[in-house]
Amino acid sequence: MPRRREVPKREILPDPKFGNVELSKFMNVIMEGGKKAIAERIIYGALEQIEKKNPGKDPVEAFTMAINNVKPMVEVKSRRVGGSNYQVPVEVRPVRRLALSMRWIKEAARKRGEKSMALRLANELMEATEGRGGAMKKRDEVHRMAEANKAFSHFRF
């Protein structure tokens, strides 16, 4: 961590096809080993699949809705107090909320059984818009953990 000043967040340029910044961030999450062209192909392929399944509905809107549904509101952090560890529920910052939701959607899509990653991602995004799927399960699990440890919320950071 720098001592002198706060390091500014880098500005991410919107994606070339839809002009959406969130989509561009998600592209960077999907990308592995600097292969952005492959990540681009996967995401645009998934959005095409969504458009095919729901004609007339904007695929970018469906993507944004899926991301917003998966965003966690609270999470637990370990805090050591008097020789024992407590799982303390804390509110998630907006930037981390977005990052976690994108990461969880990617991981849930990877675990699916469909043939191509584009198809897996499309199905995971569709399920997330409907409030189900692997990423939603992960979010609910995190929320349950926070709810179960609500008694320790007075150990705030």
UniProtKB/Swiss-Prot annotation:
InterPro entries: Ribosomal_uS7, Ribosomal_uS7_bac/org-type, Ribosomal_uS7_CS, Ribosomal_uS7_dom, Ribosomal_uS7_dom_sf
Example GO molecular function: rRNA binding
Keywords: Ribonucleoprotein, Ribosomal protein, RNA-binding, rRNA-binding, tRNA-binding
Keyword rRNA-binding listed: yes
Biological processes annotated in GO: translation
Family matches, as PANTHER family: RIBOSOMAL PROTEIN S7 (PTHR11205)
Protein name: Small ribosomal subunit protein uS7
